[in-house]
Amino acid sequence: RKFNNGGNRKTKGALVATGCIVGVFVLTNAVLVASVLVPYGLGLPNYCGIGLYLLLSTGMVFFCLAGRTLRQEVRMTFEVTDRSVEEGRRQVARIVGRDTSNLSAQEVRTAALETLAENLSDGVVAPLFWMLLLGVPGMMTYKMVNTLDSMIGYRTERYERFGCWAAKIDDYANYIPARLTALLIVFAEKLMRWKRTSVKWLMGFVGRYGSQHASPNSGWPEAALAGVLDCQFGGGHNYFGVYFYKPFIGDYPRLLTTADMWRSLQIAMAVEMMMVGLMLLVMLIG
């Protein structure tokens, strides 16, 4: 708020975003190096430094991953919406940025599954992807990139200029992970054998709708999940009092059910396990 006023908001926003991102990368590296060197400097056995390093690294990894929490929130959203639309609106507001005060039960459920798909990329696949490339510091740095985007990367009058750099960095950081997430969703569905459609058809569906989203990345995992469920995502929503239209993803605007929620959660779990397996495979080969 201190920097987001007056002139040169775009430059100020770029400096703030760059400073935060570089700062997290440097600080994380420094902390992890110190966790090994400090015990050694104090004359402690080597395993003390190694143990501290592993403890801190593990804590950072779990801090960056949001798969379990997201699945719980989505499940709770469907459960409370079955009881009361008003409760569902309050629950889904915990995981989406849009105005939920006037959403119907169908829109609440749709918002929850859209968020599950999008954050399967942002909260699981992308952090692990950047960990694979740049280690734990890369994972923590990605977390900062994603956090900045969720805080200031909005196309509103207040943040359009100040947050544009943060939003652009987030777009670049998620470009490969978003498409990888869509691919993993398709493969996860094929492993579960829910649909008789081919991988080629599903990939064609993803390619047709993934690029139509207002975001260059969010549409890909959302299109993959919509294709798996035979449903429709998208439509207009209010964000901080501003109306945004998102093109529809899918051709079948049917009502979503609890069965769709459970299928989506199973897909999410499968994608997480496949991504971890892919990481281990690359590390072994490398």
Task: Please describe what each predicted stretch is.
Residues 1-140, 153-286:
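Hydrophobic alpha-helical transmembrane segments
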Residues 144, 148, 152:
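Active-site His/Glu-centered metal-binding helix of metallohydrolases
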